[in-house]
């Protein structure tokens, strides 16, 4: 059992590591923006549209949620100004007044809520529909999935009324997993602590009270279902993972899984299908590893990515690079992996830093990372949020992913 002293020394270590990280940011990043949110967000996702306001910055939008103590919770559409290539960005610039660093021209990386929508309980997860990004689904501490069209709400709520477009019924407990079908508009899957996956078509006829019953309820897991994801290319295929350590592959046309794999040695918390390859997917687990799978032969794990020091809760493929994958979780780190480097020769010194496929470690958070999102418009730009209210937008230095020999002398970069 952890004592108070343990917690304090852990905080001290995290703080020391953060100081080293901050000192090294000019060498490691082309962009770093840190913002303290009013409340922690358990979820983050970039919206796909951007606005170019001037030659030196563009306006991007993020879907966030709140996790308040006892106050009203909100689903948030927030805007953030991002530098263009013409802007001069200084990753080392620190604003003591704001407690933020990173700046360029008149833009300081501030995240400003554009629209606040009342939400019942904290927002466990929020994801937009790919075919119509103004439609957002959320998971909360209730068993229901809520659907909103954010264009139908004022920028600030007039009162505390909770008024989603739809309430999707089918679960008996809360959960986190949520996935819109990338090929068929309106189809959505949800995973729950009740050991099931529910499937809805939001184009269906809802009742007068705005409630819509699940079209199918899939039962195959023997414990909590942690995550669910549609296959990116096959519109009727999806995967689910859970605390029973299993990966299940399903087809909508049948109510039993086509494949059931013992995927990890502990709970499986997340999965993601590769957007470029119809056979490749990744799973992340409490066993501290990310596993790589080939749907053509699920009996054999293709590869195990090992470098995290604690449970993994998120895994996501880059939307721009077929071989790039990122993972994050309880160890406060976000790891970026490059599949093309698996098996490359390493010096003993390099091996101490991790396997050859470990491209980058983002060490800017001092608490568990709750969620992250790859920017769909800006390659290599990531937004990550942690339990201590911190939101960071960052991009690793291009000499890291361009395989250019690092010009920073090794003795100038401190090790954490």
From Swiss-Prot:
State a single Gene Ontology molecular function.
Answer: histone binding
InterPro entries cross-referenced by the UniProt entry: G-protein_beta_WD-40_rep, Histone-bd_RBBP4-like_N, WD40/YVTN_repeat-like_dom_sf, WD40_repeat_CS, WD40_repeat_dom_sf, WD40_rpt, WD_repeat_RBAP46/RBAP48/MSI1
Xref: Pfam families: CAF1C_H4-bd (PF12265), WD40 (PF00400)
Q: Where in the cell is it found?
A: Nucleus; Chromosome, Centromere
Q: Give the primary localization class.
A: nucleus
Start-end of each WD repeat: 118-158, 170-210, 220-260, 263-303, 307-347, 364-404
> Which keywords does this chain's UniProt record carry?
Centromere, Chromatin regulator, Chromosome, Developmental protein, Nucleus, Repeat, Repressor, Transcription, Transcription regulation, WD repeat
- Report the record's disulfide bonds: none
GO CC annotations, alphabetized: chromosome, centromeric region; DRM complex; ESC/E(Z) complex; nucleus; NuRD complex; transcription repressor complex
Biological process according to GO: cell fate specification; chromatin remodeling; embryo development ending in birth or egg hatching; embryonic digestive tract morphogenesis; mitochondrial unfolded protein response; negative regulation of vulval development; nematode male tail tip morphogenesis; regulation of DNA-templated transcription
Quote the subunit structure annotation. Answer: Binds directly to helix 1 of the histone fold of histone H4, a region that is not accessible when H4 is in chromatin. Probable component of a NuRD-like complex, composed of at least lin-53 and hda-1. Interacts with lin-35. Interacts with hda-1; the interaction is direct. Component of the DRM complex, at least composed of lin-9, lin-35, lin-37, lin-52, lin-53, lin-54- dpl-1 and efl-1. Interacts with hcp-3.
Under PANTHER family, the record lists: WD40 REPEAT FAMILY
> Which family, according to UniProt?
Belongs to the WD repeat RBAP46/RBAP48/MSI1 family.
Q: What does this protein do?
A: Core histone-binding subunit that may target chromatin assembly factors, chromatin remodeling factors and histone deacetylases to their histone substrates in a manner that is regulated by nucleosomal DNA. Required for hcp-3 and his-1 stabilization, localization of hcp-3 to centromeres and for proper chromosome segregation. Synthetic multivulva class B (synMuvB) protein. SynMuvB proteins are required to repress the induction of vulval development by Ras signaling and probably act by forming the multiprotein DRM complex that represses transcription.
Q: Any idea what this protein is called?
A: Probable histone-binding protein lin-53
